From Swiss-Prot:
Recorded family membership: Belongs to the cytochrome P450 family.
Cofactor: heme
BP GO annotations: secondary metabolic process; terpenoid biosynthetic process
Other noteworthy facts: In A.calidoustus, the austinoid gene cluster lies on a contiguous DNA region, while clusters from E.nidulans and P.brasilianum are split in their respective genomes. Genetic rearrangements provoked variability among the clusters and E.nidulans produces the least number of austionoid derivatives with the end products austinol and dehydroaustinol, while P.brasilianum can produce until acetoxydehydroaustin, and A.calidoustus produces the highest number of identified derivatives.
Taxonomic superkingdom: Eukaryota
Protein's cellular compartments: Membrane
Species the sequence originates in: Aspergillus calidoustus
The protein's name: Cytochrome P450 monooxygenase ausG
Annotated binding of heme, by residue: 470
InterPro entries: Cyt_P450 (IPR001128), Cyt_P450_CS (IPR017972), Cyt_P450_E_grp-IV (IPR002403), Cyt_P450_sf (IPR036396)
First-level EC class: oxidoreductase
EC number: 1.-.-.-
Membrane topology field: Single-pass membrane protein
Length: 529
């Protein structure tokens, strides 16, 4: 649930093979009558020649300049390459320089080597600011949810100071709901059944998070959960398609694209569900109801009042859902695939189950039990190391011209990212391409304070770094550990005969392959949890 961190915008987009070249744009007859086809063509070609922004004051090398003399064709090809081949572009760029430029949907961005991570994280003139909103076209109706990324403190502060403090109180809710949700997905069949880890993780974690964010009644409303999970997935896909167009044409395209119209309907329908709940609470409170609600509806309102900062309750809830649903479900889905890929998976499964049983036999699900899941913590961090949420991370906007410590110049107005490659650096991680389950357990035993799943360091930027690191990572870690514990104790898990599926690449995002499958079979758990 990272706010202002592109590694967790997560999330939640279609793979490149699903992105369509926008050549199917249908203009309504009325628009042609008003504007005239010649006028539209003139606008199109003026934009093509004059407005595509490859102009950049930086002298850093440009990795994907595109081909062609006409700006829009060159820009389209560069954006298409960015969407489908960013990992290759980053590798190519780093082979040439420690700082380089990449043509992206929102202009030309600067990508820096990992050694700059701490400096970028702490620099006072580099902030998430407007870049998230620009990436997701927040000025266009249907995408206004993203306007709060990096600009509003209400959400991040609510998560940091209120959600995190409630983790102990929320654990009973998570542990009670998880087995019911898991059983509804994987059933109790004593024979092997093929399932989607991606769909299972999203189903369970979206419902758990909804109960925490909006309370019992609305959190169990299937329409609410459907709207938020659908918006989560479709908004990123729609933004990817929209970003293939020049910025000046995107508002027009968004008015005509069915996918963008659907986003506007989701926001309208979600507001119709949330507003009555808020109004009912406020009405009851004004008539003496002293009931305390322990959910994000109240946390956001309290934080807004304390800070004197306005917020939109609906858009804030939708942004919370985007961060939480994707971050947690992507991590859980990927770790299931990584575990099944191990040749010694059965041995590792026994070790994980032994740890779960040992941790829970005392007081059950409490903070101590969750902290004692050390091997599981290491497994999750190792999975995130091998498949982070994004190819580049820590997006920052330069509010003025900056000179880094080695003299590298960052022009004012630039968008800067860190290449997310340190987690495969053999100087930091021996056998960097291997999944080693106890890699971080061993480091913890040696006193490495950065070896915890929730720890943020320049060597492992899974949850960001510095003051803008993901504030919801503690909740996400607890949530995933609880669900994974139920899965491992209650089910045998393996790959089907066709084996693993590689992650999908879509722009900056590295996504757990939504087409991947695993096989599950009910087993008798050693203890009741």
């Amino acid at each position: 649930m990272a706010m202002g961190n592109p590694g967790l915008w997560t999330h939640f987009s279609r793979s490149p093979r699903e992105l369509r070249i926008p050549n199917d744009l249908e203009l309504p007859n009325g628009l042609l009558v008003v504007c005239g086809l010649p006028g539209l063509l003139l606008l199109f070609f003026v934009t093509a020649i004059l407005l595509y922004p490859f102009r950049n004051k930086s002298d850093l090398p440009l990795i994907n300049p595109g081909k062609g003399r006409i700006g829009i064709l060159r820009g389209y090809r560069a954006r298409k390459t960015f969407a489908a081949e960013l990992p290759r572009l980053v590798t190519e760029g780093l082979s040439k320089a420690s700082a380089f430029r990449i043509a992206a949907p929102d202009g030309v961005n600067i990508v820096l080597a990992p050694r700059y991570a701490h400096e970028i994280a702490e620099h006072p003139d580099l902030n998430p600011g407007p870049i998230a909103g620009d990436e997701f076209n927040c000025h266009i109706d249907g995408f206004e949810v993203f306007a709060q990324l990096g600009t509003s403190d209400v959400i991040a502060e609510s998560v940091r100071t209120r959600l995190t403090r409630q983790l102990t109180k929320l654990t009973p809710l998570l542990t009670t709901e998880t087995p019911l949700l898991l059983q509804s997905q994987w059933k109790d069949a004593p024979t092997w059944v093929e399932v989607s880890p991606h769909e299972t993780a999203l189903f369970i974690l979206s419902r758990l998070s909804s109960l925490v964010f909006v309370g019992d009644d609305l959190g169990r409303n299937p329409d609410w959960v459907h709207i938020l999970t659908s918006y989560n997935t479709e908004a990123f896909a729609a933004a990817q398609e929209l970003n293939l167009w020049p910025q000046i044409l995107r508002p027009l395209v968004a008015r005509l694209k069915p996918s963008c119209r659907q986003l506007r309907r989701y926001i309208r329908d979600a507001r119709a569900l949330l507003v009555p709940v808020i109004e009912q609470r406020r009405h009851a409170q004004s008539h003496g109801d002293r009931r305390e609600y322990n959910d994000a509806i109240e946390w956001l309102d309290q934080t807004s009042r304390s800070a004197g900062q306005p917020y939109d309750p609906l858009l804030s809830q939708m942004l919370l859902a985007i961060g939480s649903f994707h971050t947690s479900s992507d991590l859980l889905g990927q770790v299931l695939l990584d575990l099944c890929s191990r040749r010694d998976w059965e041995v590792l499964a026994r070790e994980l189950r032994k740890e779960i049983i040992s941790s829970l036999q005392g007081a059950g699900w409490d903070k101590i039990a969750l902290n004692n899941l050390k091997l599981m913590d290491s497994v999750l961090k190792e999975s995130q190391r091998l498949k982070p949420a994004s190819t580049v991370t820590m997006g920052r906007y330069a509010s003025r011209e900056i000179r880094l410590s080695d003299g590298t110049a960052i022009p004012k107005g630039s968008t800067v990212f860190i290449a997310n490659v340190a987690m495969r650096d053999p100087k930091i991680y021996p056998e960097p391409d291997a999944f080693i389950p106890d890699r971080f357990t061993t480091r913890r035993e040696k006193g490495d304070s950065s070896a915890y799943l929730v720890s943020a360091s320049p060597e492992h930027i899974g949850f960001g770094l510095g003051r803008h690191a993901c504030p919801g990572r503690f909740f996400a870690a607890n949530e995933v550990k609880i669900v994974l514990s139920h899965m491992l104790l209650k089910y045998d898990i393996k790959f089907p005969d066709n084996g693993a599926a590689a992650p999908s690449t879509s722009g900056i995002f590295l996504e757990t392959n939504p087409d991947a499958r695993i096989c599950v079979r009910r087993r008798k758990e050693e203890i009741v949890i």
